[in-house]
Amino acid sequence: GRAENFLRL
């Protein structure tokens, strides 16, 4: 999800 994608930054 979006939250996970953000954490991968």
Swiss-Prot record:
Location within or outside the cell: Secreted
Chief localisation class: secreted
Domain of life: Eukaryota
Biological-process GO terms, alphabetical: neuropeptide signaling pathway
Record's keyword annotation contains Metal-binding: no
Record bears the keyword Repeat: no
Positions of modified residues (Leucine amide): 9
GO cellular component: extracellular region
Keywords associated with the record: Amidation, Neuropeptide, Secreted
Similarity field: Belongs to the FARP (FMRF amide related peptide) family.
Function: FMRFamides and FMRFamide-like peptides are neuropeptides.
Name assigned to this protein: Extended FMRFamide-6
Organism encoding this protein: Namaquaphasma ookiepense
